[in-house]
Amino acid sequence: SSKVMNVYVDGELRDFALVDVALSKERFVASRAIWDMETVFEVFLTRAEPASIGLSSIGARLEEVSLADEGGLQYCIADAEAPTPEDRLVLAPIAPGVIPSVAISSWRRMPDGERISIEKRYCTVALDGERSFAVTDAQQLELEVRRDGPPIIDVNLTLKVAANQGLFNLSPGN
């Protein structure tokens, strides 16, 4: 099985992501606003691979985590208004043609199966950049990386096998 990042609100499973969960200071995030590094303050990843594009590419500049590796990665975006010498500045492609420098205040590996509690605050939780929901400062948000996600298909291998078996050959008699 692949990895998933489960998101719990007040102890109940609310949703999950296959790659990334981003927390934004905004109370509502339009579909493209999650790429605004001035609003994102914390990111949780199931994987962080150097060739990726998106929030996971930032994580890959800190520590590489593949699908085969145990656990995930958590990082915090530094406060742009109050940078510190300890912040780590990385250059990463977060969207095609968008390669900002991003200051990271901290990061750590996340072990499989350990729920991490987030400080209560108003924020928007964005999942894989596809869907989002808001939480209030009265709700407890927790995240956990697990290895019980959906099966993964190797697309390149699948297409290679199909081509070798002639499945794309439309000539008569095949």
Specify the residue positions occupied by each region the protein language model found.
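ATP/nucleoside-binding phosphotransfer catalytic cores, i.e., glycine-rich phosphate-binding loops
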Residues: 81-174
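Glycine-rich, charged/polar anion/phosphate-binding loops
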Residues: 3-8, 31, 35-37, 75-77, ...
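Catalytic core of DAGKc-family lipid kinases
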Residues: 1-69
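Short hydrophobic-aromatic micro-motifs
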Residues: 15-24, 53, 75, 90-91, ...
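Active-site beta-loop-alpha substructure in enzyme catalytic cores
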Residues: 52-96
